[in-house]
Amino acid sequence: MIGLGRIWILGALIATSATTALAQQHTVAHQWNEQVLEAIRNDFARPTVHARNLYHASILMYDCWAAYDTTQSQTIFLGQDFDGYLCPFDEMALDIPSDLAARKEAQEIAITYASYRLIRHRYEASPQAESTMGNIYVQMVSQELDTAFTSTDYAEYGAPALGNYLAEQLIAYGMTDGSNEIDDYANTCYEQLEPNILPEVPGTSGLVDPNHWQAVELSFAIDQSGELLTETPPFLGPQWGEVTGFALRDSNLTQAERDGCSYNLWHDPGEPVYLDTNVYSGFEDPWKWNHGMVISWSEHLDPTDGVMWDIGPGSLKYDGSIPASDNLNSFYEWENGGLTAWYDEDGNFGGQGHEVNPFTGEPYATNMVPRGDYARVIAEFWADGPDSETPPGHWYTLLNEFILDGQAGQHRWRGQGPIIPDLEFDVKSYLALGGAMHDCAIAAWSAKGYYDYSRPVSAIRYMAEHGQSSDPTLPNYHPAGLPLIPGFIEIVDDADPLNFFGGEDQVGKVKVRCWKGPDYIEVPLIDVAGVDWILADRWWPYQRPSFVTPPFAAYVSGHSTYSRAAAELLELLTGSEYWPGGLAEWNAPMNQFLVFEDGPSMSFNLQWATFMDASNESALSRMWGGIHPPIDDAPGRRIGKHVGRNAFHYAETIVFPQWAQEFGGDGFLPSADCQGDFNGDGARGSGDLILFLTAFGLGWTGPYDLDNTAAVETSDLLMFLQLWDTPCD
């Protein structure tokens, strides 16, 4: 018999071989980012905590690189007063090799030790800590580095000690940043207002105010990372607004108080819509309209209903617009799903997308799939991410997959300027994205905690408990009930198949036509619940029955906030609204991709032409998944828009301070629609010439490279002079 110790060693050797192969393809920063993502997958699903961990890991990687950099890139934490925490650093004591290869090796070693120490500290108590610790040990072995080296004396021992020192300092800072890490991020003031909901039992289990959040209590609970929960999870991070951010500023802050607790509201979205339970209303009521749309979209989760959609970029497009909260019905297609912009004037779906792929000049191919498959796949893909690393980690995975890997060796900041070495581009990209994701968590959860808004499972079941609100002469009338719509929401009568459902008299209750829920799935590998009539007080979101809905309030949508911020940031980072090559794809194989139930019924690829297309799909997925109504989505997008842009511009002042100042003063100049108008004043004149001359001869690309030769030279000057003193169209 082979002993367990030998099995572990054998596994480590195999993993070391795989890690070594990976190292030949990815930078050290990329490898350690993957280790953080894997640690997240092995932990509980805590988006706020993981956004902070990704941000802190990115700070360490960047500062380890910047400490050895001889250009004007600045450190963000090392040697700085970081939000009141001083991280001392004697830069004269650090030996910086003059040889470029030796300098890069020092950067890689420092990154490795810093990342190793941070992951050990942050994930040592995670449910799969043994796996995570094994992974990072194997990573260290693959790099032939000693895990037992713990010195922080960088003057004596150089790079490995610098990595240890930085991690030690950042871990200490983390105890002061308002996250309450020392008490495992426990709530410091918030108290739940409403009783827990027991979804396995019909109704809401005693919900009094339908505008407030309920915790989900289950007989058997597993979170979105697949971890077994032994008790009902409390609200995650209701006072996360207290955490120190990256690019958040006092001008973004509103201070508020509720129920004896103070809240920092960042980018305050204002109040959501509320239900007045004493006033009659139909679906013209904004609260009922919002939650009614969640039921309506639940009806789409049937791949056999005959509705086929072309989900290719030639059919679907998102232009980045965000509706006002009082004008949502002009943006979302309540009955048929998706955006109103996806339909023509006659109500026909599709054909409103991108005309051609700008990189190939060819039209995008059609991608016909059942609407029920598309809706189910995106609900699961974006719920867990490409591999269960929570929404902040989703976007690191997409950055890694399509940009850092896809464009290795060709990186240019903003798509302009000289080619940047992969390691430098990776650490700078991670810092910008990490800062944005961290600020998103702070801003979105500050609203979640203060507004304490209910989830659809509570709202829909609450209306169902109260009956119908359409006709006082019909049974079970109440102003707070569900409005009746023939064929969609009806009353159970004596002849109804549901009249004695569950061995109880159900006549007079309200039924809805929607996804039937987990009660109709015995074996998820082979069963599909489908769409049919169910009792409305038994409505389920399209999620695992052991999860149901996230353990925090709904307003605003974290997915919408994270995804919009990431899209804004990646547009700026790459200098293009399009994914590299004009297309990013993720495969959903037939009968293998879905976890909640069997499916999809055919193999297909999710496809996005632009970063905005992907962010929009992420946001909409939460409505098909039954997790958010539109009122949660639109304000989240708006917050994400501001956070993503602010985070990128702030990161740029750190990672490229000389270029950010030299080329336009507020970051690099964006590629202009009006060729030659570099300062954006609507004409080509002396101000543009001054900016042009600062880039002349520097190998700069982007708006100054008028003839697209990857250099700014005499031919570009001649082209600019031909445009001189002419207005933009």
Ranges and model annotations:
Residues 24-672:
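Acidic/polar surface patches and capping/hinge elements
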Residues 666-729:
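Cellulosome-associated attachment modules in secreted, modular CAZymes
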